[in-house]
Amino acid sequence: MQDYIKNVLKNMPNGWLTTTTHRLDIYNETLAKTQFIESLETLCAKNNFTHKALGKLPTAYDYIRLGHPLSCLLEWGIAKTCNLDSKSVISFSSKTIPLLAILRQNALEKKNTRIIYTHEQPNLKHLEVLKQVYGYTFSLKRVNIPEIIDSFNGSTVFMTENEDIATLDLHENIDFFVTIHKRLGSVLLVNGDHNQSYISQIQHVRRRESIAMTPVNCLVALQNLLHISVKEIPTTVKANKAAVLSSIKTITGTNTKPLVGSSGLSIQYAIMMGLVDHAMEHHKGKAIKFVVPPNCYGGTNDQARRVAASINCVEVVDLPVDGDNDMVQSLDAVLKQIAQQDAIPYIIAEIPTNPRVEVPDLDMLTKVLSTSRKTSSGEKAIAPVFILDQTFCPNVHFIGEGAVLSSVKAIAYASGSKFPSAGQCTAGYCIANKKGDVFTSKIALHLELCDNEATDLQYEILAKHLPSMNQRIIEAYKNTREFVSFIEKVLPQAKINFVSKALATQGFTPSVFSLDLPTKGNTAQERETYKRGLNHKLIKAMITQIPQQSKYCVSYGQLKGCYWTIPATSTQGTTKENDKDYIARVSVSANLDLERHKEVFLEFVKSM
């Protein structure tokens, strides 16, 4: 087995190390966690490790933060070494999230947790925060020899720091083994049939609140597993981090402290938990309401509901923003309701909206956010905090001094896997305005507690690409506007959602638009079925006729080419079906053969 993995590493596709989002035309969501390994095992049985064969393996997950070929290979290799099923081995970039995932599930099931360690006490600096804010209960115990661990009424988690990440002796009284590697992350082993139900829950925590061990770090861990000596490469992480923080301040027009996480959802989780922590400390006993668009992309929606499910005082409130709904009017109504309840309103929203790419009246938005409201008893209600997902337009100045949201408490964040890194890594960042800076220390605390800060390589990639981001956005917008104008000309009956030229002059220059193709049929179901078929016909034409540039991918802000995806709202399987929008979302880059894309689109129109 070890010889086979060595040969796989020698012949693996380059994309295993560099790809951040994968082709959905070779991706089956229901088989995302198993299909890659099953296909790899078939190759292993034939001792086939050719570059061509490895390149034909099905996609492992749709984003690398959920998992990727090298994390699958690492988990499979460790599982073989420990005589486990590969699904019982889960790798993380974070050193603490595996434990937090177990604690979360046990808290929901009201089950005891015992944490056992052989080295120094686990690096959980904020044990009281875990108990008071997250609501987790646990006991700590140090042992010198693992063999003397007794049975326990609940879950026993054994934590150890070890450079050789797979050297574990399974013990029947240990339910979960967490091996921590200071530079790479951690690996969790689920022991025993009675703990198999935890696997999907732990994987979902990795999917939503953290990321899998990164491809580069998985490669190092695999080399450790195979006892291949790895040459230390000197890093310039301090310089890279300083450059990234400086770039974020410049881009956002602010001078507060930026925070950088391993993914957009990692940073969003730190924001949410930081605000919950702040509310519990400063507004004891009050309900916390996270106001979230119901059809926003799956990650935000799902994570907000997961936080609400695990913390009693937190609830999610829907904010209708698309279609016939106006964000400002919806927000005004929701804030009145929350004020009456004397609750704490935290709003998470994208501008422009996703997928309809609409921008609300920003002056009216500021007015609604600034309005003083009363509780049902006539007292002054708690002012809202606006958490702005700026991933579509990270170049727009929303929160700097004198900017449109400078007069209200606001925090802006963006997924770095889009424009900031040009799709080269998953890291995300956030920064508050002056009024919102009161929350920064709490957000930083929870980012540290979850060990979700960006990795050294992520800082390096952001340091390289952030300085050119605004120019890339401008050039990508020009291509997008030209493509949209062409589609309007050759297919005028299609409905396109894209920013107006007037909004573009204000700085809203996204390179993403949604395309609602014309349909036909006697019933709503017939029309919807026909439209979905037409969508897939269009995407198939694009990705087969321009395979080097057009991809069936859910991301945007990429360095080159054009990405297409359906449904536009989510491919993650967590947005409620009735809230999904089965229209095409198209992401255009600054670097692509636009004329060829026009040609293929025109051929598609003629074939309709």
Regions found by a protein language model. Give the residues of each.
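N-terminal "arm"/small-domain region of PLP-dependent enzymes with the aminotransferase-like
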Residues: M1-P69, W76-K80, D85, S139-A239, ...
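Conserved PLP-enzyme active-site core in the AAT-like
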Residues: I5-V8, P13, T20, I90-S210, ...
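Conserved AMP-binding/adenylate-forming core of the ANL superfamily
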Residues: I64-E75, S86-S94, L259-S263
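Composition-driven detection of intrinsically disordered, low-complexity segments
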Residues: G67, F92, P234-A239, F392-P394, ...
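Short, surface-exposed acidic
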Residues: D85-K87, G253-P258, N522-Q525
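A generic secondary-structure signal marking the coil-to-beta-strand transition
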Residues: S88, K257, K409, T509-S511, ...
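Active-site C-terminal subdomain of aminotransferase-like
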Residues: L189-A243, I411-D579, V588-D593, V600, ...
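Conserved beta-strand positions
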Residues: A349, L388, L515, V586-V588
